[in-house]
Amino acid sequence: MGCRKITLGSDDSVQEDYSNRNMKNHHGGVLLKGGHLYGYSDGRGWTCQNLKTGEVVWDSKKLGKGCIFYADNRLYCMDEGSGTVVLASADTKGWKEHGRFKLEPQTELRKPAGRIWTHPVVSNGVLYLRDQELLFAFDVKK
């Protein structure tokens, strides 16, 4: 498990540019911004990876494994275990946190070892988060 970058030629040829374990994403997704991938990599933590070279630009374990969303030059990252949500910069200089909070209350439907696998969504300046039957809306307009 890991990541691989391939290039498709005009003659339908395939060239492998790299294959490594720098971004081992599970279900949290990754996003591409300015030639860099952002996401959670198992064992490494939150990671910024150069798409062209495959090299890790930075990594951080300041938040547990989870999902990611991008809006207004910010990363919305949510820890799937604790429900902690972090607003961070989409920046190649490192993990820059602008705030965090814990999603509460949390569902009673989820088993104790269960996870929150829904992705954050921002629409019209409102951040939407869901945990089973619970839906949360936060005003995140500038």
Model-derived features with residue positions:
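Noncatalytic, solvent-exposed loop/strand surfaces
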Residues: M1-K142
